């Protein structure tokens, strides 16, 4: 449509060769979906984002319920446009920057969301997907969120719930051991879940922070905008 209006890149760059022209589309100019209408949740589905939103407490995957694909596309457009402007400063030449939403979303999602599909050799270990370990933790009066990204932090979680011996157990004491035996990862999760149910949210967060484990409350929108931080 833009070409029919006489405002396409080829037409305008003929007038101004230094032009940086940015095109944003759902699927790009080629491919079987190139003429389809599209919005954010459709891109989430096609890029695999929805399938990786796995909550063990819910038997099916779910959307990221905000504009995940739209915003990742906007960030990509900003970066690509800045790079094109720098290239023009260095070379004097303009260019056509094409950003399909499906490409931008996939690039943004891939490093962690698809890590198991990155190294596919027979001897490769894709590790534990974040979608299987990012969970809310239920306490006696609500839910909190924490994440242990190292062996030291995992031991800190065990200490925070009053069971430092769990962090010393060879089944749980290293990420290598847990990755090699995923059933132990599940077992430790069940043990910790039971321990957190005996603590309230404030107690749990204080204990985790004391153990130097990243943690915090699950705030409502209203609570978030008045949080002192």
Give a label for each model feature.
Residues 26, 222-223:
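Conserved beta-strand edge residues that scaffold enzyme active sites
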Residues 133-211, 215, 222:
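Aromatic-enriched alpha-helical interface/lid elements that frame and gate functional surfaces
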Residues 85-89, 196, 225:
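Hydrophobic residues in alpha-helical segments
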Residues 1-2, 194:
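Short strand->helix junction
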Residues 29-31, 175, 225:
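Generic structural signal for helix capping and beta-alpha/helix-loop junctions
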Residues 3-149, 159:
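Active-site-adjacent "lid/gating" segments in soluble enzymes
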Residues 123, 130, 223-229:
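Active-site-adjacent capping/gating segments
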Residues 34-35, 178-181, 227-229:
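Short secondary-structure transition/capping segments
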């Amino acid at each position: 449509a833009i070409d029919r209006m006489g405002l396409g890149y080829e037409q305008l760059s003929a007038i101004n060769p230094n032009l940086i022209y940015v095109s944003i589309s759902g699927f790009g100019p080629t491919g079987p979906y190139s003429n389809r209408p599209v919005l954010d949740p459709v891109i989430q589905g096609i890029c695999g984002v929805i399938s990786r939103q796995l909550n063990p407490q819910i038997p099916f995957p779910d959307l990221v319920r905000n504009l995940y694909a739209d915003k990742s596309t906007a960030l990509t457009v900003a970066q690509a446009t800045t790079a094109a402007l720098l290239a023009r400063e260095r070379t004097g030449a303009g260019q056509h920057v094409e950003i399909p939403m499906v490409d931008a979303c996939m690039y943004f999602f891939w490093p962690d969301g698809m890590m198991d599909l990155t190294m596919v050799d027979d001897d490769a270990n894709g590790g534990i997907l974040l979608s299987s370990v990012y969970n809310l933790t239920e306490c006696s009066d609500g839910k909190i969120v924490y994440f242990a990204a190292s062996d030291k932090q995992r031991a800190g979680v065990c200490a925070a719930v009053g069971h430092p011996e769990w962090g010393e157990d060879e089944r749980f004491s290293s990420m290598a051991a847990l990755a090699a035996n995923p059933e132990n990862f599940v077992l430790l999760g069940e043990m910790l879940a039971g321990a957190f149910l005996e603590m309230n949210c404030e107690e749990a967060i204080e204990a985790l922070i004391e153990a130097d484990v990243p943690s915090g409350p699950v705030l409502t929108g209203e609570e978030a905008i008045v949080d002192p931080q």
